[in-house]
């Protein structure tokens, strides 16, 4: 159980440290989505289908089939981007909820150190505590966040994958 516990703790720390990167990734994907939608508006042909399968695929496709293939690829890419954005937003919301469930001081310590990358001693000075006390409270808070994210109501760790 100890190895699982450490894995969950490490994963929780990674989610917190990557929080700003996740925000940035969503912004990049939103821009890619807008670009693909603009490109889709230029491809005016609806996808051609023969039976249940998309048409084309041979080296001698017609213009309509090439446009249909392009449209299909763009729509698949758009769907993947939407899925990725949804997954990141779900992870971010889970992390936000777990951190906000902490006591205000613990929330501040965790957010400042792991998300904002503020050193323990700077947080300690601001809170008028020793660096060791802040570090200890931070580690305890991370354990609580990990428990909130990964432990089910029966008290056992769930086999959950937040980011595939």
Regions found by a protein language model. Give the residues of each.
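Short amphipathic alpha helix immediately N-terminal
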Residues: 101-118
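Short, well-structured alpha-helical interface segments that form or flank functional binding sites
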Residues: 14, 24, 90, 105, ...
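Helix-turn-helix DNA-binding module
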Residues: 116-133
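A short hydrophobic/aromatic micro-motif that marks alpha-helical segments and, especially, helix-coil
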Residues: 38, 118-120, 145
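DNA major-groove recognition helices of helix-turn-helix
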Residues: 95, 134-148
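Juxtamembrane/interface motifs at transmembrane-helix termini
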Residues: 129-132, 144, 155-157
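N-terminal interaction/assembly modules
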Residues: 1-98, 147-164
């Amino acid at each position: 159980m100890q190895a699982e516990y450490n894995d969950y703790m490490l994963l929780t720390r990674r989610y917190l440290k990557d929080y700003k990167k996740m925000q940035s990734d969503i912004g990049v994907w939103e821009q890619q989505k807008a670009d693909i939608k603009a490109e889709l508006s230029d491809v005016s042909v609806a996808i051609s289908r023969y039976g249940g399968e998309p048409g084309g695929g041979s080296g001698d496709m017609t213009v309509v089939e090439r446009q249909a293939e392009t449209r299909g690829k763009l729509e698949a890419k758009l769907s993947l981007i939407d899925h990725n954005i949804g997954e990141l937003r779900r992870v971010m919301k889970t992390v936000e909820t777990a951190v906000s469930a902490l006591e205000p001081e613990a929330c501040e310590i965790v957010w400042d150190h792991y998300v904002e990358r503020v050193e323990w001693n700077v947080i300690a000075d601001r809170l008028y505590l020793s660096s060791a006390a802040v570090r200890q409270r931070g580690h305890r808070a991370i354990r609580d966040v990990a428990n909130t994210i990964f432990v089910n109501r029966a008290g056992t760790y769930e086999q959950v994958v937040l980011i595939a």
